[in-house]
Amino acid sequence: MWVFKFLLLPMVSFALSPEEMLDTQWELWKKTHQKQYNSKVDEISRRLIWEKNLKQISAHNLEASLGVHTYELAMNHLGDMTSEEVVQKMTGLRIPPSRSYSNDTLYTPEWEGRVPDSIDYRKKGYVTPVKNQGQCGSCWAFSSAGALEGQLKKKTGKLLALSPQNLVDCVTENYGCGGGYMTTAFQYVQQNGGIDSEDAYPYVGQDESCMYNATAKAAKCRGYREIPVGNEKALKRAVARVGPISVSIDASLASFQFYSRGVYYDENCDRDNVNHAVLVVGYGTQKGSKHWIIKNSWGESWGNKGYALLARNKNNACGITNMASFPKM
């Protein structure tokens, strides 16, 4: 009995001091991500959200270690935000009410011949560094710019960062930081006669007046093609034959917010309710799990240095084929 009580003492002491331990972690997290708050009340409310997220991350990773999940989570710079806030402030897919498919824009895959079992356009030099859209609903602009960058590299052999801010400010049929759609951005570049480089038109993360400068034009566009909805085989063909592809996904879950590594598959990810645009830069298989390689626009602190592996051939996981498209150059 005395031995039992003795063994319990460290556990009791530990249970009474979680706040002190979390204080240290909280201060370290704030310093790492340069977090500052307007008031003590604001900091306390953010701290409580952070603690809740931290507990969910720990619980998930325990399950992952037991083989329940194919991916792990990690605390990141979004730790003091709820998943609802992330969707509201850091996504931005806004689908036009009049959106419809046309035979003129539908991508018809060439089914003859094999395509590689895996491909990674990062290794081929088609992909610029990961960016951070900040609290501006401009995911559509980053996805569009990324797809244009891939086609520019394919056509000219040169990799050059293009300007999401040019799209945010100048695509009048979209809503800037209020959201937008990728094919609308491709149409703008086509009708405008070009898009500026990132160096000429840097990102500021808020709506500004259109400052497009034709003399700084870095790429053109001849139109776009849309991948058949729900067809992952067609998307694979497009990635292999065309290059990086703009896609939309559901990014509303905490499991996506704190994704760290592994193949992301959450059965609660809603394929019928996409809200965020990303860029598919490849595909492959990891430990028997087929995946897409996606480039996000939440900075390198998110995911695996800004990237994620998303389940492939798992019933259109997260709606990845719902609104896939690419520009023609």
Swiss-Prot record:
Question: Which N-terminal residues, if any, form the signal peptide?
Answer: 1-15
Check the record and name the SMART domains matching this protein: Inhibitor_I29, Pept_C1
The record's principal subcellular location, in a coarse class, is: other
The protein's matches in PROSITE patterns, at most eight in alphabetical order, are given as: THIOL_PROTEASE_CYS (PS00139), THIOL_PROTEASE_HIS (PS00639)
For the protein in the UniProt heading, the enzyme class is hydrolase
Q: Which cysteines are joined by disulfide bonds?
A: C136-C177, C170-C210, C269-C318
What are the GO BP annotations of this UniProt entry?
A: bone resorption; collagen catabolic process; negative regulation of cartilage development; proteolysis involved in protein catabolic process; thyroid hormone generation
Identify the keywords attached in UniProt to this record, alphabetized: Cell membrane, Disulfide bond, Glycoprotein, Hydrolase, Lysosome, Membrane, Protease, Secreted, Signal, Thiol protease, Zymogen
The record's tissue-specificity note reads: Predominantly expressed in bones. Expressed in thyroid epithelial cells.
Q: What happens when the gene is disrupted?
A: Enlarged thyroid follicles, reduced extension of the thyroid epithelium, and slight increase in the levels of Tg/thyroglobulin in the thyroid follicles. Loss of localization of CTSB/cathepsin B and L to the apical membrane of thyroid epithelial cells. Serum levels of thyroid hormone thyroxine (T4) are normal. However, reduction in T4 levels is more severe in CTSK and CTSL double knockout mice compared to CTSL double knockout mice.
State the CDD domains in the record. Peptidase_C1A
Superkingdom: Eukaryota
Keyword Kinase appears in the UniProt entry: no
**What positions constitute the catalytic site?**
C139, H276, N296
Going by the UniProt annotation, this protein carries glycans at N103, N213
This protein's GO cellular component annotations are: apical plasma membrane; external side of plasma membrane; extracellular space; lysosome; nucleoplasm
EC numbers listed for it are 3.4.22.38
Q: How does it sit in the membrane?
A: Peripheral membrane protein
Annotated catalysed reactions = Broad proteolytic activity. With small-molecule substrates and inhibitors, the major determinant of specificity is P2, which is preferably Leu, Met > Phe, and not Arg
Q: What protein name is recorded for this chain?
A: Cathepsin K
Which gene is this protein's source? Ctsk
